[in-house]
Amino acid sequence: MKAYKDMTREELFAEKEKLEAMYQDYKGQNLALNMSRGKPSASQLDLSKGMMDVLRSDSNLTCEDGTDCRNYGVLDGIPEAKRLLGGMIGAKPEQVIVYGNSSLNVMYDSVARCMYEGVLGGKPWALQGKVKFLCPVPGYDRHFGITEHFGVEMINVPMTPDGPDMDMVEKLVSEDPLVKGIWCVPKYTNPQGYVYSDETVRRFANLKPAAEDFRIFWDNAYCIHHLYNGEPAQILNILEECEKAGNPDMVYEFVSTSKVVFPGSGMAALASSTANVASIKKQMAVQTIGHDKVNQLRHVRFFGDNEGMEAHMKKHADLIRPKFEALISIMEEDLGGLDIAEWTNPKGGYFIGFDSMPGCAKEIVAKMKEAGVILTGAGATFPYHVDPQDRNIRLAPTFPTIDELKLASRVFTVCVRLVSAEKLLAEKA
């Protein structure tokens, strides 16, 4: 089929009429499908059911340093859990603090700590005026929700296949002392699935911030979440690169097992310089005596080591890879050559980034909802839920069954084509 922009008004009208009939047919099926969040499917959750059996009433609940995991204590996590989580991102155990089940919780606490208690004994951000955060876009809506909650001004930074626009990052960070941080998902970015290049990581490590208390919030959420088991993507170790550059304290790195085992029942951690870790632990000691050591021990006993975790992740990949491939194949089949959309083809992570024609995303998402298919809200991938071009949509293929996904994908391509045809017809009026 020819590109929509090359069609005559009559051809475009005929196409719209055909698509409207297809759309009404889908609406009549009373669908109830959901592609809105990056949730593991039930089959993926089944992979970790064995975790429920590794600790029993007669199990030895003592960790390697002799601590009884049933009792109070161990503020920063048992040694073997620090080693396991650190191994996911190449951090040394002494750089790691193990928290509870949620890395989002850790990120929220980290921003709150900077706002109200300051960084390494410095003046709290909240007392310095209207502080700012750089936000690579499109990006993760829950990151933006945290900084919006604290009244931080968010500045859009365009994303490229190699990472954020580093010329813009370097300029803003070096010129404005009120720029205090940046959100990053460096590996298999949310939503596009990009991987930061070596040059990008090095440029981050070598930033020269005007603010002494500037921090990179490095959310390595998908560090081992590969779709293909051949040559997985690799990124430079930001902790090591910052140390080489003489900026060891500049990064907070976050990691969790939420999409490795059971979301809500995993482990989360922060990794940073020994100075940052010492400062955070001093503040944490007022907040808690320690997190769930039994769960930490359960993880270690289940996986054994990082090789065991990597073998487990290959099972996840085998389940979700066909879903990514099915969605991309259907988009290529139904939208290829029409010149009305672009999408990414990630090699890991949980999302596919989709760009419609400008001005169409909200209407596409609304039509999908009318047809019984829920997507992430248009604009969610931008601060304040405002996509300046109204074109980005985050697609999350992991949760539905493969048959549900294929059906939802067909509904999606019909909605994209219908909204695009209507827009072009209006422009040709």
Name the predicted role of every residue range.
Residues 99, 240-321, 334, 421:
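Conserved core segment of the aminotransferase class I/II
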Residues 314-328, 340-355:
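Conserved glycine-rich beta-strand-loop-beta hairpin in the small C-terminal domain of fold type I
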Residues 353-358, 375-410, 414-415:
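Conserved PLP-binding active-site segment of the aspartate aminotransferase-like
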Residues 61, 67-212, 223-246, 320, ...:
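Conserved core of the PLP fold type I
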Residues 364-370, 408-413:
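Short amphipathic alpha-helices in soluble, non-transmembrane regions
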Residues 2-76, 86-87, 370-373:
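N-terminal "arm"/small-domain region of PLP-dependent enzymes with the aminotransferase-like
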